[in-house]
């Protein structure tokens, strides 16, 4: 059974030797990249390092969970990224694939499509009994390994501990020539912004949880369960899909800037990308590709006085989301056509880059941004 077939079939605890009521996501109160410390808080906390932490230097570019380090060998760089989070789906195998894809995504965002080594990080929840542990952990490891194999890399170590919560993650390392790494600060006025996966993952995961918990939310908002289930399967597919093809094409089509969209949401990562440009730029987001029906859920939540997971503000968390890329419009159209063919999934031009007269770069979503409803393709 391949990845998509498994997602479409759904996870049955009983056929995997577990009790009928086993739910992996009960082992944590947080979900996926939604566990991230808010971006503004994290930036403040990082000031503790001050002179120890080099940010936006010509030689050492450091992100929030990745780094590019010059080696003593001319032209070579050590590219390294780490990530870990809590489970957000109940199939341990698919969760393993999602975890691996998410760890690799920061390499791919820099155009580095070859990973030389991975480490796996795993905290086994103490609430798992021995039988559950001996079924769940191997399934997770197999999923992580299969995704690593698909990425053309190997897992050569890691750390496994016991913990009050189930934690999943890893480290990805690549030694790359400087020419293999996309410069993130080269966006120019006239560039367009590309997004390679739709947003709405947090809405899909949480609304699916409402079905399982039977907490009254489905009835309160008058939601359609089949539509939520369909969206959830689509999210599982895109979270477990590697951004590797997207990374390879960054070089072919001369990308000027790139990042991946994860826990800080589309706008949060667009702001990060705008902030590191050499010249003051404005990243203007004009379109929001949203997984089908997730906008309707957000609308109904907002109508009840909620925030709709801040989907329209662009800060709704994504897990193993797509790449956000700046490149010329001419190349963007070719990039999207080839990527869509390789991944059998759509991508979009969602905005533009303009010059800014003030000293600081910003990103913003237009108040009347067009919402694109993206149907499932699996």
Curated annotation (Swiss-Prot):
One of the protein's GO biological processes: selenocysteine biosynthetic process
Top-level EC class as recorded in UniProt: transferase
Protein's UniProt keywords contain Kinase: yes
Site (Important for catalytic activity): 36
Keywords, ordered alphabetically: ATP-binding, Kinase, Magnesium, Metal-binding, Nucleotide-binding, Selenium, Transferase
Cofactor: Mg(2+)
GO CC annotations, alphabetized: cytoplasm
Pfam families (alphabetical): AIRS, AIRS_C
Superkingdom of origin: Eukaryota
Binding site for Mg(2+): 65, 106, 260
EC number: 2.7.9.3
Binding site for ATP: 36, 63-65, 83, 106, 158-160
Reaction equation(s) it catalyzes: hydrogenselenide + ATP + H2O = selenophosphate + AMP + phosphate + 2 H(+)
Cofactor note: Binds 1 Mg(2+) ion per monomer.
InterPro entries reported in the protein's UniProt record: PurM-like_C_dom, PurM-like_C_sf, PurM-like_N, PurM-like_N_sf, SPS/SelD
Gene3D superfamilies: PurM-like C-terminal domain (3.90.650.10), PurM-like, N-terminal domain (3.30.1330.10)
Active site: 33
Quaternary structure, from the entry: Homodimer.
Functional description taken from the UniProt entry: Synthesizes selenophosphate from selenide and ATP.
Family from the record: Belongs to the selenophosphate synthase 1 family. Class I subfamily.
Name the UniProt record assigns to this protein: Probable selenide, water dikinase
Upper taxonomic lineage: Eukaryota, Metazoa, Ecdysozoa, Nematoda, Chromadorea
Gene designation per UniProt: seld-1
């Amino acid at each position: 059974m391949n990845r998509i077939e498994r997602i479409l079939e759904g996870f049955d605890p009983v056929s995997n030797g577990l009790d009928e009521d086993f739910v992996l996501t009960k082992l944590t109160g947080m979900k996926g990249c939604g566990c991230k410390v808010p971006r503004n808080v994290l930036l403040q906390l990082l000031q503790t390092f001050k002179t120890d932490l080099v940010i936006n230097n010509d030689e050492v570019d450091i992100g929030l969970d990745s780094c590019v380090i010059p080696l003593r060998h001319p032209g070579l760089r050590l590219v390294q990224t780490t990530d870990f989070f809590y489970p957000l789906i109940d199939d341990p195998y698919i969760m393993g694939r999602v975890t691996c894809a998410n760890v690799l995504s920061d390499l791919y965002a820099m155009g580095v499509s070859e990973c030389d080594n991975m480490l796996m990080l795993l905290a086994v929840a103490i609430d798992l009994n021995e039988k559950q542990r001996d079924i769940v952990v191997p399934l997770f490891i197999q999923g992580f390994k299969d995704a690593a194999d698909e990425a053309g890399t190997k897992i050569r170590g890691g750390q496994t501990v016991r913990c009050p919560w189930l934690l999943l993650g890893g480290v990805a390392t690549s030694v790359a020539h400087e020419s293999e790494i996309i410069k993130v600060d080269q966006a120019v006025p006239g560039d367009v912004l590309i997004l390679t996966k739709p947003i709405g993952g947090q809405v899909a995961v949480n609304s699916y949880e409402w079905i399982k918990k039977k907490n009254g939310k489905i009835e309160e908002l008058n939601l359609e369960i089949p539509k939520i289930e369909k969206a959830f399967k689509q999210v599982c597919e895109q979270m477990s899909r590697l951004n590797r093809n997207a990374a390879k094409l960054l070089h072919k089509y001369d990308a000027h800037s790139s990042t991946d969209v994860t826990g800080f949401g589309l706008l949060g990562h667009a702001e990060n990308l705008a902030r590191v440009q050499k010249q003051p730029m404005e990243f203007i987001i004009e379109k929001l590709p949203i997984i089908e029906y997730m906008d309707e859920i957000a609308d109904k939540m907002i109508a009840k006085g909620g925030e709709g997971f801040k989907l329209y503000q662009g800060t709704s968390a994504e897990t193993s989301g797509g790449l956000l890329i700046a490149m010329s419009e001419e190349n963007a159209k070719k990039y999207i056509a080839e990527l869509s063919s390789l991944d059998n999934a759509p991508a979009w031009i969602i905005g533009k880059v303009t010059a800014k007269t003030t000293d600081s770069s910003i990103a913003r979503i237009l108040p009347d941004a067009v919402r694109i409803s993206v149907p499932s393709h699996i």
